[in-house]
Amino acid sequence: MKERIKLHDKVFKPLIPGEEIEKSIDAVAAKINADYEGSGTVPVLLCVLNGSILFTGELMKRLTFDVDLMSIKLSSYQGTSSTGTVHMDMGLTGDVTGKEVIIVEDIVDTGRTIEALVKILYARKAAKVKVCTMLLKPEMYNKPLALDYVAMEIPNDFIVGFGLDYDGLGRNYRDIYVLDTETQA
């Protein structure tokens, strides 16, 4: 784990080592496997681009049942701030009619994006929708929607790494870093 990373004009310091992320993915995959293994259901695993690419890939490797992988691209952030609006940048890559869908998200904070996506999926006639997120900011989450699978909870800080970015950079780090408010470039 690097001591500090610089992305654009911001400096980030270590928050969660990759080994801890891997263990949390093992745990959340075990919960999903317990719910689906032997059920005969082939759910859609819906990767929310771009942030959940790494999480989805790691999660899929640990699942012990068949899944149908699809993706969608939504955005609600500009720089380090939420815009308050959810935009669909790329539509669903398949048909969810009559299917059970597990949304795979990188991070849930206020819940606006996940709430909008659940509405989209039910409007597209999904039979059932579950939510799996790598990270949850519980102090920010204010929606009645249940989150079925949560790998880790974190404080309300701006983070990068393991799929999460700051203006396009930082997704490729295997560790998660937090904005260093004391040391800015």
Residue positions per predicted region:
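PRPP-associated nucleotide enzymes
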Residues: 1-185
